[in-house]
From Swiss-Prot:
Enzyme Commission code(s) on record: 3.4.24.-
One GO CC term on file: plasma membrane
Location of the protein in the cell: Cell inner membrane
Binding site for Zn(2+): H434, H438, D511
Cytoplasmic face residues: 1-9, 138-632
PROSITE patterns, per database record: AAA (PS00674)
Entry-linked Gene3D superfamilies: 1.10.8.60, 3.30.720.210, P-loop containing nucleotide triphosphate hydrolases (3.40.50.300), Peptidase M41 (1.20.58.760)
Gene behind this protein: ftsH
CDD domains named among the record's database cross-references: RecA-like_FtsH (cd19501)
Subunit structure: Homohexamer.
Residues spanning the membrane: 10-30, 117-137
Organism encoding this protein: Helicobacter pylori (strain ATCC 700392 / 26695)
UniProt name for this protein: ATP-dependent zinc metalloprotease FtsH
Active-site residues, Swiss-Prot/TrEMBL: E435
Length: 632
């Protein structure tokens, strides 16, 4: 949706501005009257002069004034000079000789009220009117931005414009299964009569689910582009505003506009903003505006009056588990299409799409980049290509080289390299032992990812060093020994500090937290312990947003104590095993630490070389895990 380009009115044609100016003029006009309805002297005078009371009395004594008006706090004396009338105004002071003096000089005098009914009323009403005017002005501006006036309830019609996307399926890569699922939708939209003649009902809606950055919006645009139909897009949060009923009104307007241009596609991004379940834990939620909007969406998707106007609703979310069951039933969202993170081949194809227009050197190997980026989404890969191009430009290079791509991958995974951050030799030594411990355990533990690089250069906000592990492929299942291997690798850093420095630091805090979470999952969710057996103790949170496990406790205090004891014992058992492994390879780790201290970075190949040379020199049986067994 794009806002229409409506001509703006000139500033002084705004009704609110004109009303304010009119009110100011009215005040000046009403102030020209006395309380008896006659024009005030100030209005008839050519000029007024503020003088002292003594001067006014002197003018009266010299017979230089014609009329005197006496108020409660002011005294006015008028004097005519040729064709001009001058009014002298002074603060009144208690003076019993004034009236006798006026009688003696035979000067006309009278009393006057210093305020009148009109100005008194305006004095009370004007602040209220100003506040009301400002509120109406701000509310009107806000509602215009939302698609309507203050009393127009923000009609969505002014915001809706149909797009004709130029995106095609060929512009997408890495989601072949998802594309196959929606190809049929394109056929429905192109040839609706073919299916109508067979008595088939066209699907009302397709829900695209998957992690952030996997191309759900792009896929929806590609469907519209392939079918050559109008594409209406709106974010879920755009339906709900401060006025109750506005969301339902916008849903009606959106579907009405789409039906007029049918066949067409409506795309609702982040539909969980309006489609959240109305009951959570058996208690009905109380957001009336969202519920009205959802009810209207359900009614529209039931297709009242739309049998001959094929409008297909595509929606995207990364939180399908919280959507209302009424929204998910057949007849509304008939299908769910998983748009997942790409596998190795998918990443290669996505990289090929994003390198179009980028000048690449001959040494660029996209397969190697794809191996380094397991678990990343399409948006991450696009960012890596762009970051590599920026790095090449920053270094005044004419082409993007493989090194730029590798640096971009590391930057995306570990954060920006902080070469300016100076750490003391003592801390540098601690970090070198810590990262060497991670690297050695990773290379000698079956089921762990292969080491690609070890660095003690600070990166990101907190990392003083890092070990870059690159799994050969995405993992969809984890066996128990693989979880144990991950725990061992996480404990390797702290164990190395303990073995070689005989003192531990705070650098392993995140490693310990992650190791604890893995064991907690084994106990409470995966049924991999004697504590729970096959019983699930906690529910997993959002699968696509990485929410971990729920905090609701569905077990007794005794079970909680047993769980804590199991986690503690397993951590101690694996820590003891890791310390023993590092002690067995003490000299190899010392060599690794020295090279890290001198060079700051060593490759995974060099790590494996150091371990292998140590084993040969000491006639040890190799404990290095071969590549084909590394993640099996």
């Amino acid at each position: 949706m794009k806002p229409t380009n409506e001509p703006k009115k000139p500033f002084f044609q705004s009704p609110i501005i004109l009303a304010v100016l009119g009110g100011i003029l009215l005040i000046f006009f009403l102030r020209s009257f006395n309380s008896d309805g006659s024009f005030s002297d100030n209005f008839l005078a050519s000029s007024t002069k503020n003088v002292s009371y003594h001067e006014i009395k002197q003018l009266i004594s010299n017979n230089e004034v014609e009329n005197v008006s006496i108020g409660q706090t002011l005294i006015k004396a008028s004097h005519k000079e040729g064709n001009n009338r001058v009014i002298y105004i002074a603060k009144r002071v208690p003076d019993l000789t004034l009236v006798p003096l006026l009688d003696e000089k035979k000067i006309n005098y009278s009393g006057f009220s210093e305020s009148n009914f009109f100005t008194d009323m305006l004095g009370w009403l004007m602040p209220i009117l100003v506040i009301l005017g400002l509120w109406m002005f701000m509310a009107n501006r806000m509602q215009k931005n939302m698609g309507g006036g203050i009393f127009g309830m923000g009609s969505a019609k002014k915001l809706i414009n149909a797009e004709k996307p130029n995106v095609r399926f060929n512009d997408m890569a890495g989601n072949e299964e998802a594309k196959e699922e929606v190809v049929e939708i394109v056929d429905f939209l192109k040839y609706p009569e073919r299916y109508a003649n067979l008595g088939a009902k066209i699907p009302k809606g397709v829900l695209l689910v998957g992690p952030p950055g996997t191309g759900k919006t792009l896929l929806a645009k590609a469907v519209a582009g392939e079918a050559h139909v109008p594409f209406f897009s709106m974010g879920g949060s755009s339906f709900i505003e401060m006025f109750v009923g506005l969301g339902a009104s916008r849903v009606r307007d959106l579907f009405e506009t789409a039906k007029k241009q049918a066949p067409s596609i409506i795309f609702i991004d982040e539909i969980d903003a309006i489609g959240k379940s109305r009951a959570a834990g058996g208690v009905v939620s109380g957001n009336d505006e969202r519920e009205q909007t959802l009810n209207q969406l359900l009614a529209e998707m039931d297709g009242f009056g739309s049998e001959n106007a094929p409008v297909i609703v595509l929606a995207a979310t990364n939180r399908p588990e919280i959507l209302d069951p009424a929204l998910m039933r057949p007849g509304r969202f008939d299908r769910q299409v998983l748009v997942d993170k790409p596998d190795f081949n998918g990443r290669v194809e996505i990289l090929k799409v994003h390198i179009k227009g980028v000048k690449l050197a001959n040494d660029v190997n996209l397969q190697e980049v794809a191996k380094l980026t397991a678990g990343l989404a399409g948006a991450d890969l696009a960012n890596i290509i762009n970051e590599a191009a920026l790095l090449a430009g920053r270094n005044n290079q004419k082409e993007v080289r493989q090194q730029h791509l590798k640096e971009a991958v590391e930057r995306g995974i570990a954060g920006l390299e902080k070469k300016s951050r100076r750490i003391s030799p003592k801390e540098k030594k601690i970090v070198a032992y810590h990262e060497s411990g991670h690297a050695v355990i990773s290379e000698m533990t079956k089921g762990s990812a292969r080491v690609n690089k070890v660095s003690i250069i600070p990166r990101g906000m907190a990392a003083l060093g890092y070990t870059l592990n690159t799994p050969e492929e995405n993992k969809y299942l984890m066996q128990k020994h693989e979880l144990i291997a991950e725990i061992d690798v996480l404990l390797g850093g702290r164990a190395a500090e303990d073995v070689f420095l005989e003192e531990i630091s705070t650098g392993a805090s995140n490693d310990l937290e992650r190791a604890t979470d893995i064991i907690k999952g084994m106990v409470s969710y995966y049924g991999m312990s004697s504590v729970s057996g096959l019983m699930v103790l906690e529910k997993q949170r959002n699968a696509f947003l990485g929410g971990g496990y729920g905090s609701s406790r569905e077990f007794s205090e005794k079970t909680a104590e047993e769980m804590d004891l199991f986690i503690k014992n397993l951590l101690e058992e694996r820590y003891k095993h890791v310390k023993q492994t590092l002690s067995d390879y003490r000299e190899a780790i010392e060599i690794m630490v020295k090279e890290l201290f001198d060079k700051e970075v060593i490759t995974g190949e060099r790590v494996r070389e150091i371990i292998s040379e140590y084993e040969v020199a000491n006639n040890l049986e190799s404990r290095l895990i071969p590549l084909e067994e590394q993640a099996s």
